[in-house]
Each structure stands twice: as structure tokens, then as C-alpha cells.
A protein has these predicted regions:
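RNA pseudouridine synthases
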Residues: 1-214, 304-306
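Accessory RNA 3′-end/elbow-binding domains used by RNA modification enzymes
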Residues: 1-42, 46, 50, 106, ...
Length: 324
């Protein structure tokens, strides 16, 4: 008989402060080595140039990835004016000579303000967007023609925080899928001197912030002391914006079989958000009429995520440790 896969020994989330020069895959590989298992996913990659928040989900928590779709992101970013690059960041090839720009704070603030709101953004050709099944950057490296369709994005905050020489720094909150590189390139085009992204730190993904993030070296030190699990955000603490209900053992059995179940008003507890400093402003606790629910046992173990089919009747859509 084929060997059955062993369950992951740890379930929960890690917030890593990714260093510059490392790929997101490098960090995932490092955590897999420290944890001793491969069941690890993430909530969005970072380019090697970028530093900051990389959220990893481990074990059973990987089944929650879809519920984080659309979480807003926050960044601090430095735009270097004077020339554009083919990748829109400092790792690309300069497109023209480096001119000494004369930057006007008022103009930059106006252009940033004009980009707040929803709009269509064309991704950089040096991106992982697929073209006929292949990443666009593969085609761009071969100097093949790359045509990418604009995608809807939204910028919620785009605030100038400082200027020094040819560099301007910003605080940005945006929808998932927004390219900060493109914001830098577009501003340079509008000013007429060219610009590219010189530095960037992701400071938040939804409710996860840089305040919570640890260096990979910190995690390695904890693992050497046998305290890897102590650095996890527990499975039961994830998706805190969703309401919860603790069910009795007889109902727990039904839930773990995947059957519909009813919840009384008295059982429902609204979502409870205690956002760390720097988290995005998007999330609000959801009440009794929320379309989804976290289901807990009497021992406060998360056993399922369920979806409302009619008021106060729910269908499990993710079941942890299901019964046959």
C-alpha cells in the first residue's frame, strides 16, 4: 500500500520580515527546512528587491488561503526620479540618460492624490502575469512583444512622506494586485523625467503587519530551542473578523461529517478585531448576519468554516479533521 502522507505537526500562520535579495520561495524553503514539513503556503509573494511582510500559512491553515483573497496591502516606497528602467525598478536597464530632476512637492502630491481611487492599471511586462500560459517576464527577456491587458486596481492612500534629492518616499495602501513599480513609472512619465521604484517595504497584508514580523534568523533560533510552534499565530486566531459559534459534541459530529447545521442567536459571537499597529484599514468585525462562520468545539478548537444557506443554517465548506 502507498504510504499515507503524515499530517503537518504545526498549524497556523507566520509573519516573516523578508530581507532584500531573497525571493519569497527562498523564505518558504527555509521555513520548510526549519519546520520539517512541506505543507506551507503564502498570502502573496514579494519581489527580491522588496522587504517586509510575507505571511506564511502552515499545515491546516493552508486551507484558509482563499478566505484572504482581496486583502489590502500597505507599503512604504521610494521612487527615484531622473530615469525610467525596463522593469520599472532599480534592477532593470535604464531607458535613457540620468537627468537631474527638479522635483516640486506640490506637483508630486497632486499626482499622488489623482491616483487615489479605482482605475485600470497595466502590469509591467517584466511581471509574472501569464501570456499564453507563460510568464510575461520570460517573453520580455527574449525581447518578444508582450501585450498585457489593464486590470482593475484601487489605491486607498498615496501619501508623500519625504523628499531628498532625486528620491521621493510614499506611504501607500492599495488593493491586492496593484503594482507599486507601475505607480513609480507612471509618475515619472507624467513629470517628464522618468522614475523607477528604488526601494519598497510591505508593511501590512490585511490584519498582518510588520509589527508582528520576525526575521528568519529569529525563527531559526526558536527552532533550535524546540520553540518553533511558539512563534506561530494559532489556527484558532486566524480570520478573527468572522463570527464564531461553539457547538456541542452531537452537533460537532454533524459538522465534521460535512452536514448542514443550525446555530442559535445565543451561540453566535460576532467577529472581534484587535488589529496590530500598521495593519490595513479594511477589516471590520462581522456580526450575526455574516455569510461565513468559524465553528469551534467545546474545547475551543477550530473544526470548520461554514457558509450560510439560509439565516442561521450553515453548510461546512472547509472541515478540519473530517469524519468519514
Amino acid at each position: 500500500m502507498p504510504r499515507q502522507p503524515q499530517p503537518a505537526p504545526f498549524d497556523g500562520a507566520l509573519v516573516i520580515n523578508k530581507p532584500q535579495g531573497k525571493t519569497s520561495h527562498d523564505i518558504v524553503d527555509a521555513v520548510r527546512h526549519l519546520a520539517g514539513f512541506r505543507q506551507i503556503g503564502h498570502l502573496g509573494t514579494l519581489d527580491p528587491l522588496a522587504t517586509g511582510v510575507l505571511v506564511l500559512l502552515l499545515g491546516k491553515a493552508t486551507r484558509l488561503v482563499r478566505f484572504y483573497t482581496g486583502r489590502r496591502k500597505r507599503y512604504t516606497a521610494g521612487f527615484r526620479f531622473g530615469f525610467a528602467t525596463n522593469t520599472y525598478d532599480s534592477e532593470g536597464v535604464a531607458q535613457g540618460p540620468d537627468v537631474a530632476p527638479v522635483l516640486d512637492r506640490g506637483v508630486i502630491e497632486r499626482l499622488a492624490a489623482e491616483s487615489v481611487g479605482p482605475f485600470e492599471q497595466t502590469p509591467p511586462i517584466f511581471s509574472a502575469k501569464k501570456v499564453h500560459g507563460r510568464p510575461a517576464y520570460e517573453l520580455a527577456r527574449k525581447n518578444e512583444v508582450v501585450e498585457l491587458k489593464p486590470a482593475p486596481v484601487e489605491v486607498f492612500e498615496y501619501r508623500l512622506t519625504g523628499m531628498e534629492g532625486a528620491m521621493a518616499r510614499f506611504s501607500i495602501e492599495c488593493s491586492s494586485g496593484t503594482y507599486i513599480r507601475s505607480l513609480a513609472h507612471d509618475m515619472g512619465q507624467k513629470i517628464g523625467c522618468g522614475a523607477h521604484l528604488a526601494e519598497i517595504t510591505r508593511t501590512a497584508v490585511g490584519e498582518f503587519s510588520l509589527e508582528q514580523a520576525m526575521e528568519i534568523e529569529e525563527l531559526a533560533a526558536a527552532a533550535r530551542k524546540g520553540k518553533f510552534q511558539s512563534r506561530l499565530i494559532p489556527l484558532e486566531s486566524l480570520l478573527p473578523n468572522l463570527p464564531r459559534a461553539n457547538v456541542l459534541p452531537i452537533l460537532e459530529k454533524r459538522v465534521r461529517h460535512g452536514g448542514k447545521f443550525n446555530v442559535t442567536v445565543a451561540q453566535l459571537q460576532p467577529g472581534h478585531m484587535e488589529l496590530p499597529p500598521g495593519a490595513t484599514t479594511q477589516l471590520e468585525p462581522e456580526g450575526a448576519h455574516a455569510p461565513r462562520l468559524r465553528v469551534f468545539s467545546q474545547q475551543n478548537k477550530l473544526i470548520a468554516i461554514a457558509e450560510a444557506v439560509v439565516p442561521r443554517t450553515y453548510q461546512p465548506i472547509v472541515v478540519f479533521d473530517p469524519l468519514p
